[in-house]
Amino acid sequence: MNDVSKASLPKAIFLMGPTASGKTALAIELRKVLPVELISVDSALIYRGMDIGTAKPNADELKAAPHRLLDIRDPSQAYSAADFRRDALAQMAEITSAGRIPLLVGGTMLYFKALLEGLSPLPSADPEVRSRIEQQAAELGWEALHQQLQEIDPVAAARIHPNDPQRLSRALEVFFISGKTLTELTQTSGDALPYQVHQFAIAPASRELLHQRIELRFHQMLASGFEAEVRALFARGDLHTDLPSIRCVGYRQMWSYIEGEISYDEMVYRGVCATRQLAKRQMTWLRGWEGVRWLDSENPDRARKEVLQVVGAIAD
C-alpha cells in the first residue's frame, strides 16, 4: 500500500508493553486528552471473575476510561487470536464511525500481530482428529507425540514444549487435517489491518526495574485477595489446568498451591518467576517489532507528552 492510500485510512493507536509496565495508567491518561476509545488486547482480561490476578482496571479506572473486550468470556471458555481479531475489528469500526480513534492497549503480542497482519488460513478444529490425538497421547504419552511432531514439523516442535498438550495437539491436528505443517501455513498471512496505525511500546529502561515492578505487583495482588479469587474459581468444580484461563500467569501457580502440590512460599516464588518469563517473551516480541516508538515507563509524564506529539496532530 502506498503512502497516499495509507494516509486516507482511519487512524488507530497501539499501546503495547510487557506486564507491569504502566500501559493501562498511560492509556487512561491519554483518554482524558484525546478523542480515543480503549480496546483491551489481553488474553487474560477477557475472563470474568479473574480481576485481581490479571491486574484488571478497577471500577474507578473503568468509569474514567471504559475498556472494550473485558469480561467477555467465562473462564471455562476458549478464545483464539481469530476470535480477538473479529471482535477487535468490529469494535474499531464502531469507534471510527463515531468519529473517535481506537486505542488498543495490552500485552498479548500474538493478538496485536493477528490484528496487524491478518491470520494464516489454518483449518478449524476437528473434534474427531483431536480425540484421536488425545487417545494416542493417553497410550504413548505427550513426549512420544512431541517426537512425532519433530519428524513432521521440526520448526514448530522447537517452539512447543512437550508439556504443552494444547499447542502440541493443535500442531498435529493442523497437519492431519490439511496435510500441511503449521510452519508452512503460518507463513501465509491473511488480510492486513485497514488502518493507519501509530505504534507505541512502553517499558522501564532496565530489566531490573521491570523485575522490581513485577515482584511488587505480585505482592500487591496477594494483599488484595488474589488467593480468595482463585479459591472461588477452584470451588466451581468445572475448571482445571488444561484451560487457557487457569494456565494464566499467577493462576496456575496459585492453583498448584490450593491443590496442595506446592507451599505458599513456592507459589509466590514461581508466580513471580513465571511473570518475569512472560515479560521477557513480550520484550522479545517488541524488540523485533517494526515501526514502534519506545516510551519510558519510569517517566509517565514524558511518555504522555511523546504520544501527544505524534497523535495530537492526527486527532485534530
Swiss-Prot record:
| Keywords assigned by UniProt, alphabetized | ATP-binding, Magnesium, Nucleotide-binding, Transferase, tRNA processing
Site (described: Interaction with substrate tRNA): T108, R130
Tell me the Pfam families matching this sequence.
IPPT (PF01715)
The set of disulfide-linked cysteines is none
Family to which the UniProt record says this protein belongs: Belongs to the IPP transferase family.
Q: Which PANTHER family does this entry report, sorted A to Z?
A: TRNA DIMETHYLALLYLTRANSFERASE
What name does UniProt use for this protein? Answer: tRNA dimethylallyltransferase
What organism is this sequence from?
Salmonella paratyphi B (strain ATCC BAA-1250 / SPB7)
Taxonomic placement: Bacteria, Pseudomonadati, Pseudomonadota, Gammaproteobacteria, Enterobacterales
